[in-house]
Amino acid sequence: MSSHPIQVFSEIGKLKKVMLHRPGKELENLLPDYLERLLFDDIPFLEDAQKEHDAFAQALRDEGIEVLYLEQLAAESLTSPEIRDQFIEEYLDEANIRDRQTKVAIRELLHGIKDNQELVEKTMAGIQKVELPEIPDEAKDLTDLVESEYPFAIDPMPNLYFTRDPFATIGNAVSLNHMFADTRNRETLYGKYIFKYHPVYGGKVDLVYNREEDTRIEGGDELVLSKDVLAVGISQRTDAASIEKLLVNIFKKNVGFKKVLAFEFANNRKFMHLDTVFTMVDYDKFTIHPEIEGDLHVYSVTYENEKLKIVEEKGDLAELLAQNLGVEKVHLIRCGGGNIVAAAREQWNDGSNTLTIAPGVVVVYDRNTVTNKILEEYGLRLIKIRGSELVRGRGGPRCMSMPFEREEV
């Protein structure tokens, strides 16, 4: 195996190294009135969410997997005072601060934090207005007066524990994504600094998508089925135009993939990413949410004569997957066993969002009892974790993890 720092040529190869983000104070800055703005449906209890996340990380370590943390990698990337200052300025520029006085006060607050990881975690948590010096009434501008009841000078980033989405590892390359919502697009700044300045990863990884692009793509829609085949979702969060840009870059940079299967499915929050309805769990097995099957369209995309060739596939999905993966037969394991009530409940609680850590070995939430029983009946080994608080953000084990290294299969 090569010594390249990023090696992800499948969804199922034995996981060697993975990046997580331990939920932090950003969750304590979630408020009922602003949940929709911050892409949440409920407010997790931070203390229990951290316990659940720590248990998730330990379960991975118990399987011999090295666990990295986003906040540590980002802090390690601030390798000089100049890079640190640049990071603060980019963070401020992207924070949608409308008045100069507030920006000056926040800059002073951030420069006053000397520890790099503490600085990174503060940028993640957001900044309440009460943390800043009060602006005298006579010095307030119209923005201050109109937005006087809004509590934040800079919004928190509560979705950060879903490390799958801001960037995606593809082969030896990275797709540094432009995300669906402004509140999440700021998250990609940490990936930018990791892959530009980190002592291990900085300058050593090709980017096949860039956060400065103007069309949207998220890592939950990017699946590496094999060393030859990718699957990409056209979803609520990922535009078809982004997929075309990504694929041209992948093919031109010779990242190693020969074909992409583009999955077009229902555009709604329930099915926000492909990996919320479809994941690979073994050489010949996938979980799937039955509700997407009727309206699913799959397109095969290749690169010939310096242009994309796109063909809509009309056949059976299992047969299409078997053909592209070189296996005799593919089994589609339906979330909830196909029962309409169990399927809807367990998909909402991420029953289809499995993290495969080796062929036939998957991490799942323990709460999805119907789907878990079926997976075990298919011969899979399940590592069950609690997620009563983590699931409130609408993401499962795959959403909460970004593989950096897998063994070849």
From Swiss-Prot:
Pathway: Amino-acid degradation; L-arginine degradation via ADI pathway; carbamoyl phosphate from L-arginine: step 1/2
Keyword set, alphabetical order: Arginine metabolism, Cytoplasm, Hydrolase
InterPro entries: Arg_deiminase
One protein family per Pfam: ADI
GO terms under biological process: arginine catabolic process to ornithine; arginine deiminase pathway
A single cellular component GO annotation: cytoplasm
Gene Ontology molecular functions: arginine deiminase activity
Main location: cytoplasm
Cell compartment(s), UniProt: Cytoplasm
Protein EC: 3.5.3.6
Active-site residue list: C399
Enzyme class: hydrolase
Catalytic activity: L-arginine + H2O = L-citrulline + NH4(+)
HAMAP family: Arg_deiminase
Family, similarity comment: Belongs to the arginine deiminase family.
Protein name (record): Arginine deiminase
